[in-house]
């Protein structure tokens, strides 16, 4: 049996997060195991779920996505890939420096998820 990959989405934009969730559900090997609307709740969710894949918005209401990544980096003891996800391409360099696995622009182009 193929491995089921656990996914968490941290994004304050409900429409974008729901749209991403809808697209990801089309892939049988992905399980959406949680969504959070801010960094504080996102951190708690990550500690609880231990996802394989994190879609992280760059600008959250309580902190930047990079700040959250810096806070949790030492606590991540499992293999988790991070996809930074934002409406602004100016953050691409921060994503790369932050060891992001990938980078997606909002609105999500479903062809970019392949």
Write out the residue ranges for each language-model feature:
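Conserved sequence signature across two-component system core domains
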Residues: 10-11, 36, 54
């Amino acid at each position: 049996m193929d491995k089921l990959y656990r996914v968490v989405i941290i994004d304050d934009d409900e429409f974008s997060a729901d749209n991403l969730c809808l697209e990801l559900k089309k892939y049988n090997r992905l399980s959406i195991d949680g969504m959070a609307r801010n960094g504080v709740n996102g951190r708690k969710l990550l500690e609880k779920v231990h996802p394989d894949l994190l879609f992280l918005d760059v600008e959250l209401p309580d902190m930047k996505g990079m700040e959250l990544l810096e806070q949790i980096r030492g606590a991540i003891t499992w293999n988790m890939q991070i996809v930074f996800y934002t409406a602004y391409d100016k953050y691409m360099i921060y994503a790369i420096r932050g060891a992001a696995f990938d980078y997606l622009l909002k609105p999500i182009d479903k062809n970019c998820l392949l």
